[in-house]
Amino acid sequence: VYKRQQQEPTREHLLRDAKTLAFFIRKLFEEDIPQELYQLLPRTDATYIVAPPAHKRVQRMRVCFQYSDEQYLYVTPLDEIADEPLRVRYNIPQINEEFAETCRLLWRHAQLNLLDVSVDEAGFLTPSFIVLEPDYLLDISSLAECYRDYGHHPANYFLSRLQPIENARPLLLGNIANLFLDEWIHAEGEVDYLKCMRKAFRRYPIELAACADLRDREKERQFFDDCKLHFDHIRETVNDTFHAAGYELDKTDAVLEPSYICEALGLQGRLDYMQRDMSSFIEMKSGKADEYAIRGKVEPKENNKVQMLLYQAVLQYSMGMDHRKVKAYLLYTRYPLLYPSRPSWAMVRRVIDLRNRIVADEYGVQLRNSLEYTAQKLEEIKASVLNERGLSGRFWETYLRPSIDNFQEKLSSLSSLEKSYFYALYNFITKELYTSKSGDVDYEGCTGAASLWLSTLAEKCESGEIIYDLRIKENHAADEHKAHLLLVPSAPPGMPAEDASDVLPNFRQGDAIVLYERNSDADNVTNKMVFKGNIDFLNENEICIRLRATQQNSSVLPSDSPVSYTHLTLPT
Protein backbone atom coordinates (compact mmCIF):
# COMPACT_ATOMS: atom_id res chain seq x y z
CA VAL A 1 0.00 0.00 0.00
CA TYR A 2 2.76 2.44 0.92
CA LYS A 3 4.64 1.68 -2.31
CA ARG A 4 1.57 2.15 -4.48
CA GLN A 5 0.85 5.54 -2.93
CA GLN A 6 4.56 6.43 -2.91
CA GLN A 7 4.45 7.23 0.84
CA GLU A 8 6.84 6.29 3.59
CA PRO A 9 5.11 4.68 6.60
CA THR A 10 5.24 6.69 9.82
CA ARG A 11 6.06 4.92 13.09
CA GLU A 12 2.56 5.28 14.51
CA HIS A 13 0.92 3.97 11.34
CA LEU A 14 3.38 1.07 11.16
CA LEU A 15 2.62 0.12 14.77
CA ARG A 16 -1.10 0.40 14.12
CA ASP A 17 -0.82 -2.02 11.20
CA ALA A 18 1.37 -4.36 13.25
CA LYS A 19 -1.26 -4.36 16.00
CA THR A 20 -4.01 -5.22 13.49
CA LEU A 21 -1.96 -8.09 12.06
CA ALA A 22 -0.98 -9.38 15.52
CA PHE A 23 -4.57 -9.54 16.73
CA PHE A 24 -5.62 -11.19 13.46
CA ILE A 25 -3.00 -13.96 13.92
CA ARG A 26 -4.05 -14.34 17.56
CA LYS A 27 -7.66 -14.85 16.51
CA LEU A 28 -6.75 -17.17 13.63
CA PHE A 29 -4.38 -19.50 15.49
CA GLU A 30 -5.72 -18.97 19.05
CA GLU A 31 -2.23 -18.10 20.35
CA ASP A 32 -1.27 -15.23 22.63
CA ILE A 33 0.74 -12.30 21.33
CA PRO A 34 4.37 -12.49 22.56
CA GLN A 35 4.93 -10.22 25.56
CA GLU A 36 7.83 -8.26 23.99
CA LEU A 37 5.68 -7.49 20.93
CA TYR A 38 2.58 -6.65 22.97
CA GLN A 39 4.48 -3.99 24.94
CA LEU A 40 5.39 -2.22 21.69
CA LEU A 41 1.86 -2.09 20.34
CA PRO A 42 -0.11 1.16 20.79
CA ARG A 43 -3.02 1.27 23.23
CA THR A 44 -5.01 3.52 20.88
CA ASP A 45 -5.06 3.33 17.10
CA ALA A 46 -3.74 6.01 14.77
CA THR A 47 -5.98 6.70 11.82
CA TYR A 48 -5.27 7.83 8.30
CA ILE A 49 -6.98 11.13 7.53
CA VAL A 50 -7.64 10.90 3.81
CA ALA A 51 -9.95 13.91 3.72
CA PRO A 52 -11.76 15.95 6.37
CA PRO A 53 -15.42 15.11 6.95
CA ALA A 54 -17.66 16.67 4.34
CA HIS A 55 -19.78 19.62 5.45
CA LYS A 56 -21.60 19.61 2.10
CA ARG A 57 -21.24 18.13 -1.37
CA VAL A 58 -21.36 19.89 -4.72
CA GLN A 59 -21.85 17.89 -7.90
CA ARG A 60 -20.06 20.31 -10.22
CA MET A 61 -18.14 23.59 -10.03
CA ARG A 62 -16.57 25.63 -12.85
CA VAL A 63 -13.51 27.51 -11.57
CA CYS A 64 -10.57 29.50 -12.90
CA PHE A 65 -7.08 28.43 -11.78
CA GLN A 66 -4.82 31.14 -10.29
CA TYR A 67 -1.80 29.46 -8.67
CA SER A 68 -0.85 26.47 -6.51
CA ASP A 69 1.44 25.27 -3.75
CA GLU A 70 2.30 21.81 -2.47
CA GLN A 71 -1.09 21.40 -0.77
CA TYR A 72 -3.67 23.43 -2.62
CA LEU A 73 -4.82 24.75 -5.95
CA TYR A 74 -6.04 28.32 -5.56
CA VAL A 75 -9.04 28.96 -7.80
CA THR A 76 -11.81 31.51 -8.27
CA PRO A 77 -15.39 30.47 -9.09
CA LEU A 78 -16.82 31.62 -12.41
CA ASP A 79 -20.45 31.95 -11.34
CA GLU A 80 -19.93 34.18 -8.30
CA ILE A 81 -17.59 36.84 -6.90
CA ALA A 82 -15.16 35.66 -4.22
CA ASP A 83 -13.05 37.94 -2.01
CA GLU A 84 -10.31 35.32 -1.77
CA PRO A 85 -9.38 32.31 -3.91
CA LEU A 86 -10.91 29.00 -2.95
CA ARG A 87 -8.50 26.27 -1.89
CA VAL A 88 -8.68 22.90 -3.62
CA ARG A 89 -6.99 19.89 -2.04
CA TYR A 90 -5.26 17.74 -4.65
CA ASN A 91 -3.13 14.60 -4.84
CA ILE A 92 -5.25 13.02 -2.09
CA PRO A 93 -4.83 9.21 -1.97
CA GLN A 94 -7.87 7.24 -3.12
CA ILE A 95 -9.75 10.45 -4.03
CA ASN A 96 -7.94 12.48 -6.69
CA GLU A 97 -4.30 11.37 -6.64
CA GLU A 98 -4.64 10.40 -10.33
CA PHE A 99 -4.61 14.10 -11.30
CA ALA A 100 -1.12 14.90 -10.02
CA GLU A 101 0.20 15.30 -13.58
CA THR A 102 -2.77 17.47 -14.56
CA CYS A 103 -2.10 19.82 -11.63
CA ARG A 104 1.54 20.14 -12.66
CA LEU A 105 0.52 21.33 -16.15
CA LEU A 106 -1.98 24.03 -15.13
CA TRP A 107 -1.53 27.62 -16.30
CA ARG A 108 -2.94 30.84 -14.90
CA HIS A 109 -6.61 31.40 -15.83
CA ALA A 110 -7.06 27.81 -17.05
CA GLN A 111 -10.67 26.76 -16.59
CA LEU A 112 -11.42 23.64 -14.56
CA ASN A 113 -14.48 21.56 -13.85
CA LEU A 114 -14.43 20.14 -10.33
CA LEU A 115 -16.78 17.15 -10.02
CA ASP A 116 -18.14 15.37 -6.94
CA VAL A 117 -16.73 18.06 -4.66
CA SER A 118 -16.60 17.59 -0.90
CA VAL A 119 -16.58 20.90 1.02
CA ASP A 120 -15.38 20.77 4.64
CA GLU A 121 -16.30 23.21 7.44
CA ALA A 122 -13.27 25.39 6.65
CA GLY A 123 -14.46 25.76 3.04
CA PHE A 124 -11.67 23.65 1.51
CA LEU A 125 -12.68 21.76 -1.64
CA THR A 126 -11.81 18.11 -2.30
CA PRO A 127 -12.99 17.06 -5.79
CA SER A 128 -13.00 13.54 -7.18
CA PHE A 129 -12.41 14.79 -10.74
CA ILE A 130 -10.39 17.72 -12.08
CA VAL A 131 -11.19 18.38 -15.76
CA LEU A 132 -8.93 20.83 -17.60
CA GLU A 133 -10.52 23.18 -20.17
CA PRO A 134 -13.79 21.19 -20.29
CA ASP A 135 -15.09 23.19 -23.26
CA TYR A 136 -12.49 21.44 -25.44
CA LEU A 137 -14.34 18.22 -26.22
CA LEU A 138 -12.36 15.09 -27.07
CA ASP A 139 -13.98 12.18 -28.88
CA ILE A 140 -14.35 9.15 -26.62
CA SER A 141 -13.18 6.67 -29.27
CA SER A 142 -10.05 8.70 -30.04
CA LEU A 143 -9.19 9.01 -26.35
CA ALA A 144 -9.71 5.28 -25.72
CA GLU A 145 -7.46 4.42 -28.69
CA CYS A 146 -4.56 6.05 -26.83
CA TYR A 147 -4.47 2.87 -24.74
CA ARG A 148 -2.21 0.64 -26.79
CA ASP A 149 -0.47 -2.64 -26.04
CA TYR A 150 2.74 -0.72 -25.36
CA GLY A 151 1.38 2.16 -23.24
CA HIS A 152 -0.93 5.15 -23.11
CA HIS A 153 1.25 8.20 -23.72
CA PRO A 154 -0.58 11.38 -24.92
CA ALA A 155 1.57 11.29 -28.08
CA ASN A 156 -0.50 8.29 -29.21
CA TYR A 157 -3.37 10.73 -29.77
CA PHE A 158 -1.29 12.89 -32.08
CA LEU A 159 0.18 9.89 -33.88
CA SER A 160 -3.34 8.69 -34.73
CA ARG A 161 -4.23 12.16 -35.98
CA LEU A 162 -1.21 12.29 -38.30
CA GLN A 163 -1.55 8.78 -39.69
CA PRO A 164 -3.66 8.37 -42.85
CA ILE A 165 -6.95 6.53 -42.42
CA GLU A 166 -6.60 3.32 -44.35
CA ASN A 167 -9.54 1.90 -46.26
CA ALA A 168 -8.77 -1.54 -44.87
CA ARG A 169 -10.85 -4.66 -44.38
CA PRO A 170 -11.30 -4.25 -40.59
CA LEU A 171 -12.89 -0.81 -41.00
CA LEU A 172 -15.22 -2.05 -43.73
CA LEU A 173 -16.15 -5.10 -41.71
CA GLY A 174 -17.01 -2.91 -38.73
CA ASN A 175 -19.29 -0.71 -40.84
CA ILE A 176 -21.07 -3.70 -42.32
CA ALA A 177 -21.46 -5.30 -38.87
CA ASN A 178 -23.18 -2.10 -37.69
CA LEU A 179 -25.55 -2.45 -40.65
CA PHE A 180 -26.28 -6.05 -39.61
CA LEU A 181 -27.07 -4.91 -36.07
CA ASP A 182 -29.46 -2.27 -37.40
CA GLU A 183 -31.26 -4.88 -39.51
CA TRP A 184 -31.60 -7.44 -36.73
CA ILE A 185 -32.73 -4.90 -34.13
CA HIS A 186 -35.60 -3.63 -36.29
CA ALA A 187 -36.52 -6.93 -37.96
CA GLU A 188 -39.85 -8.48 -37.03
CA GLY A 189 -38.84 -11.87 -38.41
CA GLU A 190 -35.83 -13.37 -40.16
CA VAL A 191 -33.34 -11.18 -42.03
CA ASP A 192 -32.03 -12.23 -45.43
CA TYR A 193 -28.23 -12.17 -45.56
CA LEU A 194 -27.99 -11.48 -49.30
CA LYS A 195 -30.38 -8.54 -49.04
CA CYS A 196 -28.23 -7.13 -46.26
CA MET A 197 -25.09 -7.46 -48.37
CA ARG A 198 -26.79 -5.72 -51.30
CA LYS A 199 -27.68 -2.91 -48.93
CA ALA A 200 -24.04 -2.80 -47.77
CA PHE A 201 -22.87 -2.45 -51.38
CA ARG A 202 -25.33 0.39 -51.93
CA ARG A 203 -24.18 2.14 -48.76
CA TYR A 204 -20.40 1.66 -49.18
CA PRO A 205 -19.80 1.36 -52.94
CA ILE A 206 -16.65 3.50 -53.08
CA GLU A 207 -15.09 1.93 -49.98
CA LEU A 208 -15.64 -1.62 -51.26
CA ALA A 209 -14.41 -0.81 -54.76
CA ALA A 210 -11.30 1.01 -53.51
CA CYS A 211 -10.24 -1.46 -50.81
CA ALA A 212 -6.87 -2.83 -51.90
CA ASP A 213 -7.24 -5.97 -49.76
CA LEU A 214 -10.31 -7.06 -51.72
CA ARG A 215 -8.33 -7.20 -54.95
CA ASP A 216 -6.67 -10.34 -53.63
CA ARG A 217 -8.90 -13.37 -54.30
CA GLU A 218 -8.05 -15.15 -51.05
CA LYS A 219 -8.49 -12.03 -48.90
CA GLU A 220 -11.74 -11.24 -50.70
CA ARG A 221 -13.09 -14.72 -49.97
CA GLN A 222 -12.04 -14.45 -46.32
CA PHE A 223 -13.68 -11.03 -46.03
CA PHE A 224 -17.08 -12.26 -47.18
CA ASP A 225 -16.77 -15.38 -45.02
CA ASP A 226 -16.18 -13.02 -42.08
CA CYS A 227 -19.25 -11.00 -43.06
CA LYS A 228 -21.41 -14.12 -42.92
CA LEU A 229 -19.86 -15.14 -39.58
CA HIS A 230 -20.62 -11.75 -38.00
CA PHE A 231 -24.13 -11.78 -39.48
CA ASP A 232 -24.86 -15.14 -37.82
CA HIS A 233 -23.33 -14.10 -34.50
CA ILE A 234 -25.34 -10.86 -34.36
CA ARG A 235 -28.51 -12.85 -35.10
CA GLU A 236 -27.66 -15.24 -32.25
CA THR A 237 -26.99 -12.37 -29.86
CA VAL A 238 -30.15 -10.39 -30.65
CA ASN A 239 -32.52 -13.37 -30.87
CA ASP A 240 -31.13 -15.47 -28.01
CA THR A 241 -28.69 -13.68 -25.70
CA PHE A 242 -30.88 -10.57 -25.38
CA HIS A 243 -33.61 -12.74 -23.83
CA ALA A 244 -31.29 -14.67 -21.51
CA ALA A 245 -31.63 -14.18 -17.77
CA GLY A 246 -29.76 -11.18 -16.39
CA TYR A 247 -29.31 -9.20 -19.60
CA GLU A 248 -32.62 -7.27 -19.68
CA LEU A 249 -32.23 -6.10 -23.27
CA ASP A 250 -35.34 -5.22 -25.27
CA LYS A 251 -34.71 -4.55 -28.95
CA THR A 252 -38.22 -3.11 -29.41
CA ASP A 253 -37.33 -0.13 -27.22
CA ALA A 254 -33.78 0.49 -28.42
CA VAL A 255 -31.98 3.55 -29.75
CA LEU A 256 -29.19 3.04 -32.27
CA GLU A 257 -26.20 5.37 -32.42
CA PRO A 258 -27.33 7.99 -29.89
CA SER A 259 -24.88 10.89 -29.48
CA TYR A 260 -23.96 12.74 -26.30
CA ILE A 261 -22.07 15.91 -25.44
CA CYS A 262 -20.62 15.88 -21.92
CA GLU A 263 -19.30 19.31 -20.96
CA ALA A 264 -18.68 18.09 -17.40
CA LEU A 265 -15.92 15.68 -18.51
CA GLY A 266 -14.93 17.45 -21.73
CA LEU A 267 -16.01 14.49 -23.87
CA GLN A 268 -18.37 13.65 -26.72
CA GLY A 269 -19.28 10.28 -28.16
CA ARG A 270 -21.77 8.04 -29.89
CA LEU A 271 -22.98 4.65 -28.70
CA ASP A 272 -23.92 1.71 -30.91
CA TYR A 273 -27.01 0.57 -28.98
CA MET A 274 -28.89 1.84 -25.95
CA GLN A 275 -32.18 1.13 -24.25
CA ARG A 276 -34.37 4.22 -24.43
CA ASP A 277 -34.50 4.46 -20.62
CA MET A 278 -30.66 4.30 -20.57
CA SER A 279 -30.71 1.27 -18.26
CA SER A 280 -28.41 -0.70 -20.61
CA PHE A 281 -26.16 -0.04 -23.56
CA ILE A 282 -23.92 -1.99 -25.92
CA GLU A 283 -20.72 -1.04 -27.70
CA MET A 284 -20.03 -3.42 -30.59
CA LYS A 285 -16.58 -4.48 -31.80
CA SER A 286 -15.95 -6.57 -34.91
CA GLY A 287 -12.24 -7.04 -34.20
CA LYS A 288 -10.41 -9.42 -31.90
CA ALA A 289 -10.57 -9.39 -28.13
CA ASP A 290 -7.55 -10.19 -25.94
CA GLU A 291 -7.08 -13.91 -26.52
CA TYR A 292 -3.75 -14.23 -24.70
CA ALA A 293 -4.12 -12.46 -21.33
CA ILE A 294 -5.65 -15.54 -19.67
CA ARG A 295 -5.10 -18.99 -21.11
CA GLY A 296 -8.30 -20.43 -22.55
CA LYS A 297 -10.31 -17.27 -21.92
CA VAL A 298 -11.24 -14.29 -24.09
CA GLU A 299 -10.95 -10.90 -22.34
CA PRO A 300 -11.80 -7.40 -23.62
CA LYS A 301 -8.91 -5.25 -24.76
CA GLU A 302 -7.90 -2.37 -22.54
CA ASN A 303 -8.89 0.34 -25.02
CA ASN A 304 -12.36 -1.20 -25.35
CA LYS A 305 -12.80 -1.32 -21.57
CA VAL A 306 -11.70 2.31 -21.33
CA GLN A 307 -14.27 3.29 -23.94
CA MET A 308 -17.04 1.58 -21.98
CA LEU A 309 -16.01 3.29 -18.74
CA LEU A 310 -16.11 6.69 -20.41
CA TYR A 311 -19.62 6.05 -21.76
CA GLN A 312 -20.76 5.11 -18.26
CA ALA A 313 -19.22 8.31 -16.90
CA VAL A 314 -20.88 10.41 -19.62
CA LEU A 315 -24.31 8.94 -18.84
CA GLN A 316 -23.79 9.76 -15.17
CA TYR A 317 -22.52 13.33 -15.50
CA SER A 318 -24.66 14.34 -18.50
CA MET A 319 -27.87 12.37 -18.09
CA GLY A 320 -27.87 11.82 -14.33
CA MET A 321 -27.77 8.02 -14.60
CA ASP A 322 -26.05 6.31 -11.66
CA HIS A 323 -23.24 4.27 -13.23
CA ARG A 324 -23.85 1.47 -10.73
CA LYS A 325 -27.37 1.01 -12.11
CA VAL A 326 -26.49 1.11 -15.82
CA LYS A 327 -25.68 -2.24 -17.42
CA ALA A 328 -22.89 -1.83 -19.96
CA TYR A 329 -21.91 -4.56 -22.42
CA LEU A 330 -19.15 -5.07 -24.94
CA LEU A 331 -20.31 -7.16 -27.90
CA TYR A 332 -17.48 -8.90 -29.75
CA THR A 333 -19.29 -10.16 -32.84
CA ARG A 334 -16.34 -12.33 -33.83
CA TYR A 335 -16.94 -14.95 -31.09
CA PRO A 336 -19.75 -13.85 -30.13
CA LEU A 337 -19.15 -12.52 -26.64
CA LEU A 338 -21.46 -10.13 -24.79
CA TYR A 339 -19.16 -9.02 -22.01
CA PRO A 340 -20.56 -7.10 -19.00
CA SER A 341 -18.39 -4.08 -18.21
CA ARG A 342 -17.54 -3.40 -14.56
CA PRO A 343 -17.18 0.26 -13.59
CA SER A 344 -13.90 1.44 -12.02
CA TRP A 345 -14.01 5.13 -11.13
CA ALA A 346 -10.27 5.15 -10.32
CA MET A 347 -9.63 4.05 -13.92
CA VAL A 348 -11.97 6.77 -15.20
CA ARG A 349 -9.93 9.34 -13.27
CA ARG A 350 -6.72 8.08 -14.86
CA VAL A 351 -8.26 8.35 -18.33
CA ILE A 352 -9.51 11.89 -17.65
CA ASP A 353 -5.98 12.79 -16.51
CA LEU A 354 -4.73 11.54 -19.89
CA ARG A 355 -7.40 13.67 -21.57
CA ASN A 356 -6.18 16.69 -19.62
CA ARG A 357 -2.59 16.10 -20.72
CA ILE A 358 -3.69 15.95 -24.37
CA VAL A 359 -5.64 19.20 -24.00
CA ALA A 360 -2.63 20.85 -22.32
CA ASP A 361 -0.46 19.85 -25.30
CA GLU A 362 -3.03 21.25 -27.74
CA TYR A 363 -3.23 24.49 -25.77
CA GLY A 364 0.56 24.83 -25.70
CA VAL A 365 0.92 24.39 -29.47
CA GLN A 366 -1.77 26.93 -30.37
CA LEU A 367 -0.62 29.42 -27.72
CA ARG A 368 3.06 29.49 -28.68
CA ASN A 369 2.52 29.09 -32.43
CA SER A 370 6.23 28.26 -32.61
CA LEU A 371 7.87 25.99 -35.18
CA GLU A 372 10.55 24.99 -32.66
CA TYR A 373 8.04 24.13 -29.93
CA THR A 374 5.89 22.08 -32.32
CA ALA A 375 8.96 20.22 -33.59
CA GLN A 376 9.86 19.43 -29.98
CA LYS A 377 6.37 18.09 -29.20
CA LEU A 378 6.21 15.95 -32.35
CA GLU A 379 9.65 14.58 -31.49
CA GLU A 380 7.88 12.67 -28.70
CA ILE A 381 6.23 10.47 -31.34
CA LYS A 382 8.91 7.78 -31.31
CA ALA A 383 9.18 4.22 -30.08
CA SER A 384 11.45 4.99 -27.11
CA VAL A 385 8.83 7.39 -25.69
CA LEU A 386 5.60 5.56 -26.55
CA ASN A 387 6.81 2.11 -25.45
CA GLU A 388 6.07 2.83 -21.78
CA ARG A 389 5.75 -0.87 -20.94
CA GLY A 390 9.13 -1.74 -22.39
CA LEU A 391 7.87 -4.34 -24.86
CA SER A 392 10.38 -6.27 -26.92
CA GLY A 393 10.44 -9.34 -29.10
CA ARG A 394 8.95 -10.33 -32.42
CA PHE A 395 5.42 -8.94 -31.86
CA TRP A 396 6.77 -5.50 -30.92
CA GLU A 397 9.37 -5.34 -33.67
CA THR A 398 7.14 -6.73 -36.43
CA TYR A 399 3.67 -5.34 -35.75
CA LEU A 400 3.80 -2.44 -33.29
CA ARG A 401 7.05 -0.54 -33.72
CA PRO A 402 6.96 -0.03 -37.54
CA SER A 403 3.81 2.14 -37.41
CA ILE A 404 5.53 4.43 -34.89
CA ASP A 405 8.89 4.60 -36.66
CA ASN A 406 7.19 5.24 -40.00
CA PHE A 407 6.14 8.73 -38.92
CA GLN A 408 9.61 9.82 -37.83
CA GLU A 409 11.15 8.29 -40.96
CA LYS A 410 8.84 10.32 -43.20
CA LEU A 411 9.40 13.47 -41.14
CA SER A 412 13.19 13.15 -41.17
CA SER A 413 13.17 12.69 -44.96
CA LEU A 414 11.76 16.20 -45.44
CA SER A 415 13.98 19.14 -46.29
CA SER A 416 14.34 22.03 -43.84
CA LEU A 417 11.89 24.13 -45.84
CA GLU A 418 9.36 21.30 -46.02
CA LYS A 419 9.58 20.73 -42.26
CA SER A 420 8.99 24.42 -41.58
CA TYR A 421 5.94 24.37 -43.83
CA PHE A 422 4.61 21.23 -42.13
CA TYR A 423 5.06 22.67 -38.62
CA ALA A 424 3.48 25.99 -39.64
CA LEU A 425 0.47 24.22 -41.18
CA TYR A 426 0.16 21.96 -38.11
CA ASN A 427 0.15 25.04 -35.86
CA PHE A 428 -2.49 26.73 -38.00
CA ILE A 429 -4.81 23.70 -37.99
CA THR A 430 -4.33 23.17 -34.24
CA LYS A 431 -5.18 26.80 -33.48
CA GLU A 432 -8.24 26.72 -35.74
CA LEU A 433 -9.39 23.48 -34.11
CA TYR A 434 -8.89 24.86 -30.62
CA THR A 435 -10.78 28.04 -31.46
CA SER A 436 -13.61 26.15 -33.16
CA LYS A 437 -14.11 24.08 -30.02
CA SER A 438 -13.42 26.39 -27.08
CA GLY A 439 -13.99 29.75 -28.76
CA ASP A 440 -11.87 32.87 -29.12
CA VAL A 441 -11.14 34.62 -25.83
CA ASP A 442 -10.54 37.92 -27.65
CA TYR A 443 -14.00 37.84 -29.24
CA GLU A 444 -16.95 39.52 -27.55
CA GLY A 445 -19.42 36.87 -26.49
CA CYS A 446 -19.29 33.09 -26.80
CA THR A 447 -17.92 31.52 -29.96
CA GLY A 448 -17.03 28.03 -31.10
CA ALA A 449 -18.76 24.78 -30.19
CA ALA A 450 -18.68 25.75 -26.51
CA SER A 451 -21.35 28.36 -27.22
CA LEU A 452 -23.81 25.45 -27.41
CA TRP A 453 -23.79 25.35 -23.59
CA LEU A 454 -22.09 28.62 -22.55
CA SER A 455 -24.53 30.97 -24.29
CA THR A 456 -27.89 31.55 -22.66
CA LEU A 457 -31.11 30.95 -24.55
CA ALA A 458 -31.64 34.71 -24.82
CA GLU A 459 -28.16 35.19 -26.30
CA LYS A 460 -28.72 32.42 -28.84
CA CYS A 461 -32.07 33.89 -29.84
CA GLU A 462 -30.59 37.37 -30.18
CA SER A 463 -27.84 36.12 -32.48
CA GLY A 464 -30.23 33.83 -34.38
CA GLU A 465 -28.26 30.71 -33.41
CA ILE A 466 -31.20 28.63 -32.25
CA ILE A 467 -34.74 27.83 -33.33
CA TYR A 468 -36.81 26.22 -30.59
CA ASP A 469 -40.34 25.11 -29.79
CA LEU A 470 -40.58 23.26 -33.09
CA ARG A 471 -43.01 20.43 -33.74
CA ILE A 472 -42.43 17.36 -35.87
CA LYS A 473 -44.90 17.44 -38.74
CA GLU A 474 -43.54 14.41 -40.63
CA ASN A 475 -41.13 11.84 -39.20
CA HIS A 476 -39.07 10.08 -41.89
CA ALA A 477 -36.13 9.26 -39.61
CA ALA A 478 -36.40 5.58 -40.58
CA ASP A 479 -36.01 6.28 -44.31
CA GLU A 480 -33.00 4.28 -45.49
CA HIS A 481 -32.05 6.56 -48.36
CA LYS A 482 -32.98 9.95 -46.91
CA ALA A 483 -33.61 10.00 -43.18
CA HIS A 484 -35.21 13.36 -42.45
CA LEU A 485 -37.66 15.28 -40.31
CA LEU A 486 -40.11 17.95 -41.40
CA LEU A 487 -40.48 20.51 -38.62
CA VAL A 488 -43.09 23.20 -38.19
CA PRO A 489 -41.99 26.34 -36.33
CA SER A 490 -44.27 28.06 -33.88
CA ALA A 491 -44.00 31.09 -31.66
CA PRO A 492 -41.80 30.72 -28.54
CA PRO A 493 -43.74 30.34 -25.28
CA GLY A 494 -45.12 33.67 -24.10
CA MET A 495 -44.61 35.37 -27.47
CA PRO A 496 -47.65 36.30 -29.56
CA ALA A 497 -47.76 34.55 -32.93
CA GLU A 498 -47.70 37.87 -34.77
CA ASP A 499 -44.37 38.74 -33.08
CA ALA A 500 -42.70 35.44 -33.94
CA SER A 501 -41.46 36.83 -37.23
CA ASP A 502 -39.31 39.34 -35.31
CA VAL A 503 -36.99 36.49 -34.33
CA LEU A 504 -34.66 36.19 -37.31
CA PRO A 505 -32.73 32.89 -37.43
CA ASN A 506 -29.21 32.82 -38.80
CA PHE A 507 -29.53 29.52 -40.69
CA ARG A 508 -29.04 28.60 -44.32
CA GLN A 509 -29.57 25.54 -46.47
CA GLY A 510 -26.80 23.00 -45.90
CA ASP A 511 -25.82 24.24 -42.41
CA ALA A 512 -24.72 21.56 -39.96
CA ILE A 513 -27.02 21.51 -36.94
CA VAL A 514 -27.60 19.56 -33.74
CA LEU A 515 -31.20 18.65 -32.84
CA TYR A 516 -32.44 17.82 -29.35
CA GLU A 517 -35.66 17.46 -27.40
CA ARG A 518 -36.42 20.54 -25.30
CA ASN A 519 -39.25 20.35 -22.77
CA SER A 520 -37.95 22.91 -20.25
CA ASP A 521 -35.51 25.80 -19.97
CA ALA A 522 -32.99 23.46 -18.31
CA ASP A 523 -32.79 21.16 -21.35
CA ASN A 524 -29.77 21.69 -23.61
CA VAL A 525 -27.25 19.72 -25.66
CA THR A 526 -25.29 18.64 -22.56
CA ASN A 527 -28.15 16.83 -20.81
CA LYS A 528 -30.20 15.47 -23.72
CA MET A 529 -29.64 12.94 -26.46
CA VAL A 530 -28.59 14.84 -29.59
CA PHE A 531 -29.07 14.12 -33.29
CA LYS A 532 -26.71 15.59 -35.86
CA GLY A 533 -27.83 16.60 -39.31
CA ASN A 534 -28.01 19.29 -41.96
CA ILE A 535 -30.69 21.70 -43.14
CA ASP A 536 -32.17 20.30 -46.35
CA PHE A 537 -34.40 23.30 -46.93
CA LEU A 538 -36.21 25.96 -44.90
CA ASN A 539 -38.87 28.58 -45.48
CA GLU A 540 -41.31 30.60 -43.40
CA ASN A 541 -43.61 27.64 -42.84
CA GLU A 542 -41.44 24.53 -42.44
CA ILE A 543 -37.92 23.25 -42.02
CA CYS A 544 -36.52 19.95 -43.30
CA ILE A 545 -33.64 18.39 -41.37
CA ARG A 546 -31.59 15.67 -43.07
CA LEU A 547 -30.35 13.30 -40.35
CA ARG A 548 -26.89 11.75 -40.55
CA ALA A 549 -28.12 8.39 -39.28
CA THR A 550 -31.44 6.60 -39.64
CA GLN A 551 -33.54 6.19 -36.51
CA GLN A 552 -36.23 3.54 -36.80
CA ASN A 553 -37.57 3.88 -33.25
CA SER A 554 -40.23 6.58 -33.64
CA SER A 555 -40.57 7.03 -29.87
CA VAL A 556 -37.06 8.52 -29.77
CA LEU A 557 -38.39 11.60 -31.58
CA PRO A 558 -42.00 11.87 -30.38
CA SER A 559 -44.25 14.09 -32.46
CA ASP A 560 -45.87 15.65 -29.38
CA SER A 561 -42.58 16.83 -27.85
CA PRO A 562 -41.04 20.21 -28.76
CA VAL A 563 -37.55 20.13 -30.25
CA SER A 564 -34.83 22.69 -30.84
CA TYR A 565 -31.89 22.95 -33.15
CA THR A 566 -28.78 25.08 -33.13
CA HIS A 567 -25.65 25.44 -35.22
CA LEU A 568 -23.17 22.58 -34.96
CA THR A 569 -19.55 23.74 -35.04
CA LEU A 570 -18.00 20.55 -33.70
CA PRO A 571 -15.47 18.87 -36.03
CA THR A 572 -17.24 15.69 -37.17
Model regions and ranges:
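Conserved small/polar residues in nucleotide/adenosyl-binding loops
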Residues: 1-5, 566-572
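Charged, low-complexity interaction regions that mediate assembly/partner binding
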Residues: 16-77, 363-496
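Long, charged low-complexity segments
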Residues: 3-17
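Charged, glycine-rich intrinsically disordered N-terminal tails and low-complexity linkers that flank
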Residues: 87-89, 95-212
